[in-house]
Amino acid sequence: MAPYETSINIAATTDKVWSAIEDVERWPRWTASMTSVERLDRGPLARGSRARVKQPKLPPVVWTVTDLEPRRSFTWTARNPGITSVADHQLSPGPGNTVNVRLSVRQTGLLAPLLSLLASGLTRRYVNMEAEGLKRYCEADAVASPASSSEAHRAPA
């Protein structure tokens, strides 16, 4: 399957956006692309952390964090027979006092071409839903409690 990527600018602090992204069990509260996310370990999200993700129209999948740079990015990977899925979540400074969030997903393996035929539209739709839901969630909270400093809105350089 060809990689799919989307990005969105969010008018909220980096801390707010990162907090929403790293709290994976709460994703179903702000994106309809997730039915449930269950952490399979305790503690802060870190390399090696695992979560069982249930999404509409898809079987449950266990994702493992393979890379994490706090307040900047995390990548997680799901390995199943014939297919490996990799999803990236990256934060960077956006225009004005916004945070740019880039979400991407790619699949490799013997079954990737078949999955592309069957589910590429669904994958794109879910990634877009995640981006839009994250924006709504973070900006609604930002309006309720604006940051005290415009610098707080910026992703680290």
PLM feature segments, named:
Residues 49-56, 74-80:
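Short beta-strand segments that buttress and anchor functional surface loops
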